[in-house]
Regions:
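Alpha-helix capping/hinge segments and adjacent helical runs
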Residues: 1-63, 147, 158-184
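Short acidic/histidine-centered micro-motifs embedded in hydrophobic/aromatic stretches
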Residues: 67
Length: 185
């Protein structure tokens, strides 16, 4: 997502020409080279899903989700946080559902996790962002009269309303268990 974000930031200067003065060209290069040095996102996604999550039956992931659920408890009963806690709750549930389905079907369809690893990685990334946005909004709301804190709530709201909908698409793809895909090859 870093590479994508850098490329989208570059578009702000569309038509400007060479953007060296703003430093964004270096960010675009750095974000791309990091993917080359660190390995492809797909390899990282497969490693996350198969070696780290599937290998222990999702136990460590459940520990992580328990941390995310603490934020739900911290924001419970606060009407100003409902948008954020609802979004986080939805992402936690989607993550649990996806892992449960993948674990239940791993013997019948061992390649399923390979086909959806990238979508799972991105979905989990959005679940973590939903947690960060909920936490950020909760921390900023008591001081929202200050413009800096108000901007934090607005940024979190932007994330939930504008960026988080992609998570639904990612989780749909994970859950589809597209049985047609193996037949194509």
């Amino acid at each position: 997502n870093g590479n994508r974000g850098a490329n989208e930031a570059l578009q702000v200067w569309g038509g400007y020409g060479y953007v060296h003065e703003y430093g964004i060209e270096q960010t675009v290069r750095d974000s791309r080279i990091a993917m080359i040095y660190e390995g492809t996102n797909e390899i990282q996604a497969i490693d996350l899903l198969q070696r780290k999550i599937m290998a222990d039956g999702g136990a460590k992931l459940l520990d992580l989700l328990a941390v995310l659920e603490q934020e739900l408890e911290a924001g419970a009963g606060e009407p100003e946080l409902k948008e954020f806690t609802d979004a986080l709750s939805t992402q936690i549930a989607a993550t649990r559902e996806a892992v449960g389905a993948l674990l239940a079907a791993r013997e019948a369809d061992p390649d399923w996790s390979l086909r959806v690893a990238d979508d799972f990685l991105r979905g989990l990334g959005f679940a973590l962002l939903a947690w960060a946005w909920a936490r950020s909004a909760r921390a900023a709301l008591p001081q929202v009269a200050d413009a800096w804190y108000a901007s934090k709530v607005k940024a979190a709201r932007f994330g939930v309303q504008w960026l988080l909908p992609e998570a639904n698409y990612r989780w749909q793809r994970v859950m589809a268990r597209n049985a047609v895909l193996p037949e194509i090859g």
